[in-house]
Amino acid sequence: MTAKTLEKAPVSLGGFVHPLADSIYSVDELGTTLPASVTIYNDLGGHYEQINAGDGLINGDMSTEKRALDLAYSSTFAQPAGPRNQTFTYMGKFSIDSQYPGNWNPEGVINIVSAGILGMTQPSSASSSPASSVSPSHFSSTLSCTMAQNQADMEHIYSPPPPYSGCGEVYQDPSAFLSTSTCPISYPPPSYSSPKPNADSGLFPIIPDYAGFFQPPCQRDMQSMPDRKPFSCPLDSFKLPPPLTPLNTIRNFTLGGPGPDGPRLPTAYTPQNLPLRPILRPRKYPNRPSKTPVHERPYPCPAEGCDRRFSRSDELTRHIRIHTGHKPFQCRICMRNFSRSDHLTTHIRTHTGEKPFACDFCGRKFARSDERKRHTKIHLRQKERKSSSSSTGVSSSERGVATSICSSSSNQ
């Protein structure tokens, strides 16, 4: 809805019901300046005469002759100093049109009369028929109801802001934003002192709980705002991340906690749970002692008939795959499976043709380091043979010289 006014009114709609001061308009000036259609009544209790307020008369006379009466109004009207002897009538036309021109409401033309408290509603702007005279009490009740309804509708739009005693009431505490249900900040303080053993399996957790280290998203966003006031925050949430899991913890998790007889195997590697098969190719020297002492090899093979012991758990895991036949590494080219990752690496070189290992004597290249080592032994044997043959040749020549000297001396 848009409002069009014919006269500029510097006060709001709520200010029309206030009485005007007598010093603003005098009776003599009103008699000369107001149009003939506006009548000043001296008697408050008398009947009002008929008012002919056509659109053409109001639009023509009120817009031209009323310019001489434009005064600077203050925000509030002053109360009259003395008693009023005479009253006058002030008329204005407010045409309220809807947003679409086709939906014009004929009741949108409102005539507001202040000082005399006279209200009048014309049925249509095109009608110029004289209106019947009505009692002042009826107009007063109609105007009071209309103004009270309009003022109540516009108070929620133009209501002044609530007064604040200080700046602290305008800006809320940042901690109040964190008290919502979408961002809870009450977390139990985590502890990283020591891993808790499990009573059932005796295993230690190797992945710590990082929930206490990372802050909630709402709290992290609030700390990044420079406009907010700083607030106290507990220092427990700024804990340093826990260190990496030590090797002993990983070893205990893989093979179980150490017992009185040394490290024990997990339940998955026990002979009754794994289908351990004997090795098809036995060791070349089964009774040959190892260079590493027994106490430094605490991981024995659980398979029956296998006396192998290892100093590292990953070596034992790799060895157990020989008994179980597990081959987790697969070639993507020929789909062949291998039990060790290094075997898969060397196998892929057969497809690519890569030979990174070269012989130091002849320059021949090999795909595996053990092949180069085996080939190098051939050169070493040949070198030993040459050195042995040369040494035998020198010794035989020396013997021949010695025998010739002895024979010549005997002849003499």
Curated annotation (Swiss-Prot):
Stretch forming the signal peptide: none
InterPro entries: EGR_N (IPR021849), Znf_C2H2_sf (IPR036236), Znf_C2H2_type (IPR013087)
GO molecular function: DNA-binding transcription factor activity, RNA polymerase II-specific; RNA polymerase II cis-regulatory region sequence-specific DNA binding; zinc ion binding
Record-level GO cellular component terms: nucleus
Top-level taxon of the source organism: Eukaryota
Compartment annotation: Nucleus
Start-end of Basic residues biased regions: 374-384
PROSITE patterns in the record: ZINC_FINGER_C2H2_1 (PS00028), ZINC_FINGER_C2H2_2 (PS50157)
Residue ranges, annotated region (Disordered): 269-299, 371-412
GO annotation (BP), single: hindbrain morphogenesis
Purpose of the protein: Sequence-specific DNA-binding transcription factor. Binds to two specific DNA sites located in the promoter region of HOXA4.
Stated name of the protein: Early growth response protein 2b
Source organism per UniProt: Danio rerio (Zebrafish)
Organism lineage: Eukaryota, Metazoa, Chordata, Craniata, Vertebrata
Gene name of the record: egr2b
